[in-house]
Amino acid sequence: GDSGLRSFVSVQGSLCMFPIWKYGSEEQKEQWLPGMAAGEIIGCFGLTEPDHGSDPSSMATRAKKDGDRWILNGSKRWITNAGIADIAIVWANTDEGFRGFLVPTDSEGFEARKIQNKLSLRASVTGEFYMDDVEVPESMRLPDAISIGAPLSCLSEARYGIAFGAVGVARDCYNAALDYQQERPQFGKSLSSFQINQIKFADILTEMTNANLQAMSLGRLKEDHSIRPHHISMAKRHNCRVAIDAARTARAMMGANGVSTEYSPMRHANNMESVMTYEGTEEIHGLILGQEITGIPSFR
């Protein structure tokens, strides 16, 4: 598995299909969701901008009402699937506040570019797109998306999935290191027979189990409809840290061979650098938890 593939699926489901399902009209759901579920229509989620990442409420993208249509101008950056998407979920500022729009990527004035030379999530297409007087009809506005809370709710859905994906990363790194050490002789016995390495395996397994339990608890909260954003922030923050620590430890347990593309831990470590950044950085999730604990929003 690879976090790049999980990112593609996460964007398609949590960031594109979810807002249509939750905030869209019945006509929009019928038009877009079947094709997206079948993989025949690819979506991307346009929230992050070149100058606005952790503070989406300051976004510069604007949508202006002109009769029965909207005119969109602005740019979005670090967008998964940009360049291959058929439809973009675009979040923009309007005179009435934040709104969401369905923007076909073949619209006149819409241009997407792929971001090159990434060292992370190389299996995922990442890009940016620009809108220069892009026109969409009123029927392409998500009617129930009427505040910044709408895109943030989509991020909560994606973060929920990340909490589980991070456990998969840790497990693959654990298994890769264990297989390697069981078969690698050194000083007349396998690397896995040395005390220091057994302790490292015990530490990875313990933290991985803790992360898995937290993800399972998150799932139960979601099924009970009692899940709240700070629950998701805690799991995303914790489990991503567990995953990247497991990847780095596993890489080190393979010695120089660990930097080879033959083995997965270093690839996972590179990918997790991105995963720890998108859908809210580790620090932002710490502040979300801090607000829940103290009642004081430190970032406002």
How would you label these PLM feature ranges?
Residues S58, D106-E135:
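Flexible, small-/acidic-enriched active-site or ligand-binding loops
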Residues G1, F8-V11, Y23-Q28, G35, ...:
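Alpha-helical interface subdomain recognition
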Residues Y23-S25, D66-D68, N93-G97, T105-E108, ...:
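Short loop segments at secondary-structure junctions
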Residues A60, R69, N73-R113:
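A short core secondary-structure module
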Residues M36, D51-S54, W78-N81, A92-N93, ...:
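Short Gly/Pro-enriched turn/cap motifs at secondary-structure boundaries
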